[in-house]
Every structure is written in structure tokens, then in C-alpha cells.
Amino acid sequence: MYVAVLHRINDPEAMLSRGDRLGDPSSAPPGVVPRQFCPSKDLSAATCVWEGDSLDAVREYIDSTLGDASENTYFEIDTEHAQGLPEPAPMEAS
């Protein structure tokens, strides 16, 4: 599933520093893949798109990494009506 995240950024420096870890797919838990990061020019807000096995898995990873650097809102993307989503990430062989 695709999950969108709306970030209201409280501490831009901390958000970017902590967010570097989020952008590295090898740091994410299994089944959680970062797909897009779109910050505002003034770094007061950002949106992200993730792939994940569940919304809760994405939320737990992001909230535990960013801490108080941002307030985050999550929702599952309706892929039937969405436009411009990235192709699904390849699944790792077991």
C-alpha cells in the first residue's frame, strides 16, 4: 500500500538531519520503503509518499525517527484515483 505523510515541521534542522536516515531504504524496517520527499521552500512543511505493509508500520518508523522535529498526519492513498504515484518497489526475494 502507499501511505502519504503530511509533516508540519517544528525544527527544520532536526527534521533534515533525522530525515536523512528515513531516505535510506536500507535503514527502514522490512516492508517499508521511502518513495518521495517534497519539502516546502521555507521548510515549514513537507509531504512524503511511502510504501508499506501497513499504515501503522510506516507511522511507527517515521514517528520514532523524527521525534518532536515534526507533527505528522498519515493516510492510505487511494491508488485507484491517485495520479503520478511511483512504480511499486521491487519485492525482495525471501
Predicted regions and their residues:
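Short S/T/G/P-rich N-terminal loop/turn motif that feeds into the first structured element of a domain
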Residues: 1-45, 51-63, 67-68, 77-94
